Protein backbone atom coordinates (compact mmCIF):
# COMPACT_ATOMS: atom_id res chain seq x y z
CA UNK A 1 0.00 0.00 0.00
CA UNK A 2 1.20 3.47 -0.82
CA UNK A 3 0.18 6.43 1.34
CA UNK A 4 -0.06 9.94 -0.05
CA UNK A 5 -0.37 13.03 2.12
CA UNK A 6 -2.00 15.95 0.38
CA UNK A 7 -3.71 19.27 0.87
CA UNK A 8 -7.43 19.82 0.64
CA UNK A 9 -9.47 17.07 -0.96
CA UNK A 10 -12.72 18.09 -2.59
CA UNK A 11 -15.47 16.19 -4.33
CA UNK A 12 -15.45 16.42 -8.11
CA UNK A 13 -18.47 14.18 -8.65
CA UNK A 14 -22.01 13.96 -7.37
CA UNK A 15 -21.42 10.54 -5.79
CA UNK A 16 -18.65 11.42 -3.33
CA UNK A 17 -18.54 12.94 0.14
CA UNK A 18 -18.11 16.70 -0.16
CA UNK A 19 -14.93 17.12 1.92
CA UNK A 20 -13.32 13.73 2.61
CA UNK A 21 -10.46 13.42 5.10
CA UNK A 22 -9.09 10.61 2.96
CA UNK A 23 -9.86 7.83 0.53
CA UNK A 24 -8.54 4.50 -0.69
CA UNK A 25 -8.29 3.62 -4.36
CA UNK A 26 -6.13 1.73 -6.84
CA UNK A 27 -3.40 3.21 -8.99
CA UNK A 28 -1.47 0.98 -11.39
CA UNK A 29 -2.64 -2.15 -9.55
CA UNK A 30 -1.48 -0.79 -6.18
CA UNK A 31 -3.78 0.14 -3.34
CA UNK A 32 -3.24 3.75 -2.36
CA UNK A 33 -4.45 5.73 0.64
CA UNK A 34 -4.71 9.49 0.25
CA UNK A 35 -5.04 11.63 3.38
CA UNK A 36 -5.92 15.32 3.57
CA UNK A 37 -3.42 16.81 6.04
CA UNK A 38 -5.51 19.96 6.44
CA UNK A 39 -8.78 18.40 7.54
CA UNK A 40 -7.66 15.41 9.54
CA UNK A 41 -7.89 15.98 13.30
CA UNK A 42 -8.11 12.38 14.50
CA UNK A 43 -5.26 10.68 12.67
CA UNK A 44 -5.54 7.30 14.38
CA UNK A 45 -9.25 6.99 13.65
CA UNK A 46 -8.97 8.37 10.10
CA UNK A 47 -6.04 6.16 9.08
CA UNK A 48 -7.76 3.09 10.55
CA UNK A 49 -11.01 4.06 8.81
CA UNK A 50 -9.22 4.27 5.46
CA UNK A 51 -7.22 1.10 6.16
CA UNK A 52 -10.54 -0.67 6.67
CA UNK A 53 -11.43 0.15 3.06
CA UNK A 54 -8.25 -1.61 1.93
CA UNK A 55 -9.07 -4.55 4.20
CA UNK A 56 -12.55 -4.71 2.65
CA UNK A 57 -11.03 -4.98 -0.82
CA UNK A 58 -9.00 -7.96 0.31
CA UNK A 59 -11.95 -9.65 2.05
CA UNK A 60 -14.33 -9.10 -0.88
CA UNK A 61 -11.80 -10.40 -3.41
CA UNK A 62 -10.96 -13.42 -1.28
CA UNK A 63 -14.62 -14.28 -0.68
CA UNK A 64 -15.07 -14.71 -4.44
CA UNK A 65 -12.34 -17.35 -4.69
CA UNK A 66 -12.14 -19.09 -1.31
CA UNK A 67 -15.07 -21.42 -0.85
CA UNK A 68 -15.37 -21.17 2.93
CA UNK A 69 -14.30 -17.55 3.38
CA UNK A 70 -16.00 -16.09 6.44
CA UNK A 71 -16.69 -12.66 4.94
CA UNK A 72 -19.84 -11.99 2.93
CA UNK A 73 -22.05 -8.95 2.47
CA UNK A 74 -25.07 -11.15 3.19
CA UNK A 75 -23.68 -12.15 6.58
CA UNK A 76 -22.82 -8.52 7.33
CA UNK A 77 -26.31 -7.34 6.41
CA UNK A 78 -27.85 -9.91 8.76
CA UNK A 79 -26.78 -7.66 11.66
CA UNK A 80 -28.82 -4.71 10.33
CA UNK A 81 -32.47 -3.88 11.08
CA UNK A 82 -35.07 -5.85 9.13
CA UNK A 83 -35.72 -4.39 5.67
CA UNK A 84 -32.77 -1.97 6.03
CA UNK A 85 -30.73 -1.10 2.94
CA UNK A 86 -27.65 1.10 2.83
CA UNK A 87 -28.23 4.38 0.99
CA UNK A 88 -25.33 3.76 -1.41
CA UNK A 89 -24.89 7.52 -1.42
CA UNK A 90 -22.98 10.01 0.72
CA UNK A 91 -25.77 12.58 0.50
CA UNK A 92 -28.81 13.02 2.72
CA UNK A 93 -27.96 10.30 5.26
CA UNK A 94 -29.29 12.57 8.01
CA UNK A 95 -32.83 12.49 6.68
CA UNK A 96 -32.88 8.68 6.80
CA UNK A 97 -31.16 8.39 10.17
CA UNK A 98 -33.12 6.99 13.09
CA UNK A 99 -31.87 7.74 16.61
CA UNK A 100 -33.26 4.31 17.55
CA UNK A 101 -30.41 2.79 15.53
CA UNK A 102 -27.59 4.70 17.27
CA UNK A 103 -25.29 2.50 19.35
CA UNK A 104 -27.52 -0.49 18.59
CA UNK A 105 -27.04 -1.03 14.86
CA UNK A 106 -24.79 1.85 13.74
CA UNK A 107 -22.30 4.28 15.26
CA UNK A 108 -23.59 7.34 13.39
CA UNK A 109 -25.45 8.51 10.30
CA UNK A 110 -22.33 8.12 8.14
CA UNK A 111 -22.51 4.38 8.86
CA UNK A 112 -25.74 4.04 6.87
CA UNK A 113 -24.27 5.39 3.62
CA UNK A 114 -22.47 2.20 2.50
CA UNK A 115 -21.65 -1.13 4.14
CA UNK A 116 -17.96 -0.32 3.64
CA UNK A 117 -18.40 2.94 5.59
CA UNK A 118 -20.25 1.08 8.34
CA UNK A 119 -17.29 -1.29 8.74
CA UNK A 120 -14.78 1.57 8.45
CA UNK A 121 -16.52 3.53 11.21
CA UNK A 122 -16.48 0.49 13.50
CA UNK A 123 -12.83 -0.34 12.76
CA UNK A 124 -11.72 3.30 13.03
CA UNK A 125 -13.44 3.71 16.38
CA UNK A 126 -11.98 0.46 17.72
CA UNK A 127 -8.44 1.60 16.83
CA UNK A 128 -9.05 5.09 18.23
CA UNK A 129 -10.28 3.53 21.48
CA UNK A 130 -7.09 1.47 21.66
CA UNK A 131 -4.90 4.54 21.07
CA UNK A 132 -6.84 6.46 23.71
CA UNK A 133 -6.25 3.69 26.23
CA UNK A 134 -9.88 2.61 26.38
CA UNK A 135 -10.37 -1.10 26.77
CA UNK A 136 -14.13 -0.81 27.16
CA UNK A 137 -16.75 0.83 24.98
CA UNK A 138 -20.34 0.17 25.97
CA UNK A 139 -21.39 0.34 22.32
CA UNK A 140 -19.38 -2.84 21.75
CA UNK A 141 -20.67 -5.01 24.58
CA UNK A 142 -23.32 -7.64 25.02
CA UNK A 143 -25.47 -9.18 22.36
CA UNK A 144 -26.44 -6.03 20.45
CA UNK A 145 -26.09 -5.97 16.65
CA UNK A 146 -23.32 -3.34 16.70
CA UNK A 147 -21.15 -5.58 18.87
CA UNK A 148 -22.01 -8.56 16.66
CA UNK A 149 -20.83 -6.56 13.62
CA UNK A 150 -17.61 -5.63 15.41
CA UNK A 151 -16.85 -9.21 16.42
CA UNK A 152 -17.78 -10.53 12.97
CA UNK A 153 -15.46 -8.03 11.26
CA UNK A 154 -12.59 -8.90 13.63
CA UNK A 155 -13.11 -12.59 12.83
CA UNK A 156 -13.27 -11.87 9.08
CA UNK A 157 -9.97 -10.00 9.24
CA UNK A 158 -8.31 -12.96 10.96
CA UNK A 159 -9.86 -15.33 8.42
CA UNK A 160 -8.84 -13.18 5.44
CA UNK A 161 -5.16 -12.67 6.19
CA UNK A 162 -2.16 -14.79 7.06
CA UNK A 163 -1.98 -14.19 10.81
CA UNK A 164 1.41 -15.82 11.31
CA UNK A 165 3.28 -13.60 13.73
CA UNK A 166 0.21 -11.67 14.85
CA UNK A 167 -0.49 -11.21 18.55
CA UNK A 168 -3.32 -13.26 19.97
CA UNK A 169 -5.20 -9.97 20.34
CA UNK A 170 -4.57 -7.17 17.85
CA UNK A 171 -5.17 -3.50 18.76
CA UNK A 172 -8.52 -3.35 16.95
CA UNK A 173 -9.63 -6.45 18.88
CA UNK A 174 -8.97 -5.02 22.34
CA UNK A 175 -12.63 -4.20 22.94
CA UNK A 176 -13.55 -7.74 21.97
CA UNK A 177 -10.95 -9.13 24.35
CA UNK A 178 -12.19 -7.00 27.27
CA UNK A 179 -15.68 -8.39 26.66
CA UNK A 180 -14.29 -11.94 26.73
CA UNK A 181 -12.51 -11.30 30.04
CA UNK A 182 -15.61 -9.86 31.76
What are these regions (language model features)?
Residues 1-5:
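Short, well-ordered secondary-structure micro-motifs within conserved domains or adaptor modules
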Residues 6-182:
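Active-site-flanking segments in enzyme catalytic domains
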